[in-house]
Amino acid sequence: MFQGAVALSLDAKGRLAIPARHRDALTPDGAPLVMTVHPHRCLLVYPLTAWEPIREKITSLPGMDQATLSFKRMLVGFAQEETLDAAGRVLVAQSLRQFAALDKQVWLVGQGTHFELWSDAGWQKQQEAMLALVDNPLPAGLENFVL
């Protein structure tokens, strides 16, 4: 279970040091992890075993409609398998860094089965958008949710 948000830094080569507490779950037995893009201009970071059923679902989507094709191209087309180096770092491909506008400071945000990787500016903007929703009714299924 991946949870929490932590500010991290990309090094000059575009590598990200994965926090030690998440390494074994993210890359069990040295398995690769998968990074791909999200339409909100962040990256998704999955253990390979969690990504594979998602990829299968996406690639089996029927359709010649533009929305389905674009969805497939985005999520599967940008997907990259990467392995951690001996220091627990993973290279974030230039194409992915460019898509998500990642600079030196980034945010790794747990989402249960995976992480989101945000630029500092993108994460700040996302937090402001979440706070703006406070005055709106909760979405279906969360009406009775109490913290």
From Swiss-Prot:
Highest taxon listed in the record's lineage: Bacteria
InterPro entries in alphabetical order: MraZ (IPR003444), MraZ_C (IPR035644), MraZ_dom (IPR020603), MraZ_N (IPR035642), MraZ_sf (IPR038619), SpoVT-AbrB_dom (IPR007159), SpoVT-AbrB_sf (IPR037914)
Coiled-coil residues: none
Locations listed in the record: Cytoplasm, Nucleoid
Pfam families recorded: MraZ
Domain SpoVT-AbrB: residue ranges: 5-50, 79-122
GO process annotations (BP): negative regulation of DNA-templated transcription initiation
GO MF term (any one): DNA-binding transcription factor activity
Principal location class: cytoplasm
UniProt keyword list: Cytoplasm, DNA-binding, Repeat, Transcription, Transcription regulation
Gene Ontology CC: one annotated term: cytoplasm
Subunit-level organization: Forms oligomers.
Protein family per UniProt: Belongs to the MraZ family.
PANTHER family (alphabetical): TRANSCRIPTIONAL REGULATOR MRAZ (PTHR34701:SF1)
Protein's UniProt name: Transcriptional regulator MraZ
Source species: Azoarcus sp. (strain BH72)
